[in-house]
Design a protein with these regions (language model features):
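Active-site neighborhood of thiol-dependent amide/isopeptide-bond enzymes
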Residues: 1-43
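His-Asp-centered catalytic microenvironments across diverse enzyme cores
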Residues: 36-38, 47, 51-175
C-alpha cells in the first residue's frame, strides 16, 4: 500500500525476535507523541550485559545513538538528554530503509523528540507477541508516561502506566 515494504513496527518485531533467538534480552518499543495524529515510531531496546543497560537500536533507520564520548545510549538516556539539551550523536551511516541518509537534526531533534513523549511495550518480550491466532491472548502492555499523563483511553491503550524511569528500564535480570 505504501510501496516501501514492511513498516517500522514489523521491522522492530523481526529484529526483536532475532535478538531473542540469539539469547539477548530485547523488546520492541513503541515511541509515541503527546497527541497521536497519524505517526509514531517503533524501535528496539536490547540489553547489554557488559554495559548493564538497555541500548537504542532502530532497524528502520539503521540507527543507534551515543553520547559525545562515543558511549552507546539507551532510549531512556536519549529522552533525558534531549529534554536537558545534552549532546547526543547519531551514527554516521544512519539512513531510512537503506535509501535516505539521516541527520541528527532531523532524526533525533525533530522526528524522535516528537515521538518520545511516552514509550510503551509488551510486558513480556516473546516470539509472535502481536501475532493473532485462535486461542492466543493479546499481550499486556506497560507505558512509561510523564507525571500527570495517562495512556489509558487512547488508541493502543496499555494495561499499566508508570512514571518511574528506573522501573521501566530496570535490568531484565532483576527480580
Amino acid at each position: 500500500k505504501e510501496n516501501r515494504g514492511v513498516n517500522c513496527r514489523m521491522m522492530a518485531q523481526m529484529l526483536n525476535e532475532c535478538y531473542l533467538a540469539m539469547g539477548f534480552k530485547s523488546r520492541f518499543i513503541t515511541c509515541m507523541p503527546k497527541v497521536m495524529i497519524n505517526d509514531c515510531h517503533v524501535i528496539n531496546a536490547v540489553y547489554s550485559n557488559t554495559l548493564d543497560k538497555w541500548l537504542w537500536m532502530d532497524p528502520t533507520f539503521n540507527a543507534y545513538v551515543t553520547d559525545e564520548k562515543g558511549n552507546l545510549l539507551g532510549i531512556g538516556e536519549v529522552r533525558e538528554r534531549l529534554r536537558n539539551n545534552q549532546p547526543v550523536v547519531l551514527n554516521e551511516d544512519a539512513n531510512w530503509n537503506n535509501k535516505n541518509k539521516q541527520t541528527k537534526e532531523y532524526y533525533l531533534d525533530y522526528y524522535m523528540a516528537k515521538n518520545l513523549y511516552y514509550v510503551t511495550c509488551p510486558l513480556q518480550s516473546e516470539y509472535n507477541a502481536e501475532t493473532n491466532y485462535p486461542g492466543k491472548k493479546w499481550p499486556m502492555y506497560i507505558s512509561l508516561v510523564p507525571e500527570g499523563y495517562s495512556s489509558n483511553g487512547k488508541p493502543g491503550a496499555t494495561a499499566y502506566d508508570s512514571h518511574n524511569d528506573s522501573y521501566f528500564w530496570q535490568s531484565p535480570y532483576q527480580e
